[in-house]
């Protein structure tokens, strides 16, 4: 058996913190203005009607309403908030 750990083994053993990315509010859910809808890296989802985008590409609701997702093919996937009444 080896009496040394091997050249790489002591330099391994690290991992980064999970970033908790993904969709936070799903289609049909009622949201308040300011609620985070999607956390993402880059524009996997694009902001649609009544949705804003932060510096880190986070999508958030600009008005109170109901979440809607729209797939526009090669134009991308959009997130909208349909206002209540």
From Swiss-Prot:
Keywords: Ribonucleoprotein, Ribosomal protein. Residues 1-21 are annotated as: Disordered. InterPro entries: Ribosomal_bL27, Ribosomal_bL27_CS. The keyword Methyltransferase does not apply. Pfam families: Ribosomal_L27 (PF01016). SUPFAM superfamilies: Ribosomal L27 protein-like. GO terms for cellular component: cytosolic large ribosomal subunit. GO terms for biological process: translation. One of its GO terms (molecular function) is structural constituent of ribosome. PANTHER family: LARGE RIBOSOMAL SUBUNIT PROTEIN BL27M, RIBOSOMAL PROTEIN L27. Belongs to the bacterial ribosomal protein bL27 family. This is Large ribosomal subunit protein bL27. The lineage of its organism: Bacteria, Thermotogati, Deinococcota, Deinococci, Thermales.
């Amino acid at each position: 058996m080896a009496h040394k750990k091997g050249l790489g083994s002591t330099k391994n053993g690290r991992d980064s913190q999970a970033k908790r990315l993904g969709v936070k509010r799903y289609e049909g859910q009622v949201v308040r203005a300011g609620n985070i809808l999607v956390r993402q890296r880059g524009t996997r989802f694009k902001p649609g009607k009544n949705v804003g985008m932060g510096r880190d590409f986070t999508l958030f609701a600009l008005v109170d309403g109901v979440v809607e997702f729209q797939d526009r093919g090669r134009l991308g996937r959009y997130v909208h908030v349909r206002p209540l009444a």
